[in-house]
């Protein structure tokens, strides 16, 4: 048992097939990138422990297939999640326009109203961009989401996306339970919020 782990959090990664959900997960957990990575079949699952403001949190990260034929997995996949990363491909506009569908699904199946949402525009290393950064930012603002652009290939923004999501979860009262007995939590409402490792890229809007 990890006695010094503050809490275990369930994080989901959702979005259309081919947007790079699995690549973002593997870059974050294993620091690897495979350009020939096959599409996820069903659900993949990885665990990683990170430190946020002196507190260690264990992340149980669920990566699901974007294809319609796997939608029967949906209810159990969403149950109990505290955070969700919603991914689109900045080079494919249709993956951006379908974000509303994913948000509707999230609202239908998620068991928490206060879960933290992060919008990630992936594949910014490519030249053929179809979705402007300001469009992503505007969408995130509309739906009260954190926002960042990233590249699983080059690492840009990946670590920040997960760290900022977890930090926001830990700052949300009642969203998580402490695994440490009688130790208290080293998070203070009086402390100024740090800008984050992304240097202003990532913001709650």
From Swiss-Prot:
It catalyses: GTP + H2O = GDP + phosphate + H(+). A motif (Switch 1) lies at residues 31-45. Mg(2+) binds at residues 22, 40. Keywords: Cell membrane, Developmental protein, Endoplasmic reticulum, Golgi apparatus, GTP-binding, Hydrolase, Lipid droplet, Lipoprotein, Magnesium, Membrane, Metal-binding, Methylation, Nucleotide-binding, Palmitate, Prenylation, Protein transport, Transport. Regulated by guanine nucleotide exchange factors (GEFs) which promote the exchange of bound GDP for free GTP. Regulated by GTPase activating proteins (GAPs) which increase the GTP hydrolysis activity at the ER membrane. Inhibited by GDP dissociation inhibitors (GDIs) which prevent Rab-GDP dissociation. A lipid is attached at residue 198 (S-palmitoyl cysteine). Residues 203-205 form a propeptide. Pfam families: Ras. Gene3D superfamilies: P-loop containing nucleotide triphosphate hydrolases. A lipid is attached at residue 202 (S-geranylgeranyl cysteine). GO terms for molecular function: GTP binding; GTPase activity. Disruption phenotype: The most common abnormalities observed at 3 days post-fertilization are microphthalmia, microcephaly, pericardial edema, delayed jaw formation, a reduced overall body size, and a general developmental delay. Further characterization revealed that the rab18b morphants have delayed retinal development and abnormal retinal lamination, residual nucleated lens fiber cells, widely open choroid fissure, and microphthalmia at day 3. It is an enzyme of class 3 (hydrolase). The modification Cysteine methyl ester is found at residue 202. It is found in: Endoplasmic reticulum membrane; Golgi apparatus, cis-Golgi network membrane; Lipid droplet; Apical cell membrane. Belongs to the small GTPase superfamily. Rab family. The small GTPases Rab are key regulators of intracellular membrane trafficking, from the formation of transport vesicles to their fusion with membranes. Rabs cycle between an inactive GDP-bound form and an active GTP-bound form that is able to recruit to membranes different sets of downstream effectors directly responsible for vesicle formation, movement, tethering and fusion. Required for the localization of ZFYVE1 to lipid droplets and for its function in mediating the formation of endoplasmic reticulum-lipid droplets (ER-LD) contacts. This is Ras-related protein Rab-18-B. The lineage of its organism: Eukaryota, Metazoa, Chordata, Craniata, Vertebrata.
